[in-house]
């Protein structure tokens, strides 16, 4: 665990290097407010690790989940600590709970589920923690009793939530779950608006004027007008031809009629002359 603590300090220093000037260990110890050592295998806290932990001046959250720790001895007293997480370890005695009361008197959240506590009455010790409002104890042997929450609420009056349920039996999300849910809601809303705006953009794109399309439409319109003009001209030509033919035919008929009339007049004159001649004789 000593290496994990030093690595965390070095990481903080690199993240807070300003203008090429490295942050100091003192800055890191004063500024770090949480130390998460989940999964780092250990059974107890060594003296070297204890001395390192003493350097943290403003630690508010300490997580030792799934480390296999069996005792809390050598973890220094941390008055600023608000959250202590010790789930899935090998803790089992009332002495562990007493140590928590003595050394972390201001904690508001204690997660100690998945350990080996068998006697629910041992937890009455925690009533000395006046700020404790959230307690996690599920997957301990005593929690097999379906009424364990009710019993804990009775001798821990300040506690508001046990294993995500309040005194009325209503489920209450943890702060981490609330943040995750808010993040999902924000993303859902964001995705909704992005999709909505995208649809609107797609609709707008459908109605964006296209100069080429306008030109094509104008060309097509011009072609149609030209075709109509040609059809009109062709029709006029045909009408003129029909008129000329009719005119010629009419003129031909009139000419024939005049020729026939002249012939008839000549014949009539001949007949008149013959008649006059006969009378003279």
Curated annotation (Swiss-Prot):
Keyword set, alphabetical order: Leucine-rich repeat, Repeat
GO molecular function, one term: histone binding
The UniProt record lists the keyword Repeat: yes
One of the Pfam families matching this protein, by short name: LRR_9
Residue span(s) of domain LRRCT: 140-178
Cellular component GO terms, alphabetical: nucleus
UniProt cross-references to InterPro entries, sorted A to Z: AN32, LRR_dom_sf
Keyword Membrane: no
Annotated region described as Disordered, given as residue ranges: 197-281
Regions of compositional bias (Basic and acidic residues) in chain numbering: 245-266
Spans of repeat LRR: 29-52, 56-78, 79-103, 105-128
Acidic residues biased stretches: 197-244
Family: Belongs to the ANP32 family.
Name this polypeptide is given: Acidic leucine-rich nuclear phosphoprotein 32-related protein
């Amino acid at each position: 665990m000593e290496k994990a603590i030093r690595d965390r300090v070095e990481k903080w220093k690199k993240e807070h290097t300003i203008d090429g000037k490295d942050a100091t260990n003192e800055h890191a110890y004063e500024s770090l407010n949480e130390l998460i050592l989940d999964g780092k295998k250990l059974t107890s806290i060594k003296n070297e690790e204890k001395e390192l932990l003493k350097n943290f001046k403003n630690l508010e959250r300490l997580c030792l989940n799934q480390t296999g720790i069996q005792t809390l001895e050598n973890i220094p007293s941390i008055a600023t600590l608000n959250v202590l997480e010790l789930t899935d370890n090998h803790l089992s005695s009332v002495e562990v709970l007493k140590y928590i009361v003595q050394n972390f008197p201001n904690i508001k959240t204690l997660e100690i589920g998945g350990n080996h506590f068998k006697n629910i009455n041992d937890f009455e010790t925690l009533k000395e923690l006046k700020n404790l409002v959230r307690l996690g104890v599920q997957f301990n042997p005593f929690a097999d009793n379906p009424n364990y929450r009710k019993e804990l609420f009775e001798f821990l009056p300040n506690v508001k939530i046990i294993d995500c349920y309040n005194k009325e039996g209503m489920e209450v999300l943890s702060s981490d779950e609330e943040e995750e849910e808010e993040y999902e809601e924000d993303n859902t809303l964001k995705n909704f608006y992005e999709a909505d705006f995208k649809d609107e953009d797609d609709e707008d794109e459908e109605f964006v004027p296209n100069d080429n399309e306008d030109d094509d439409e104008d060309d097509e319109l011009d072609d149609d007008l030209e075709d109509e003009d040609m059809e009109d001209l062709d029709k006029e030509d045909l009408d003129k031809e029909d008129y000329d033919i009719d005119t010629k035919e009419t003129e031909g008929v009139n000419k024939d009629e005049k020729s026939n009339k002249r012939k008839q007049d000549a014949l009539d004159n001949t007949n008149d002359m013959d008649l006059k001649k006969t009378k003279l004789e």
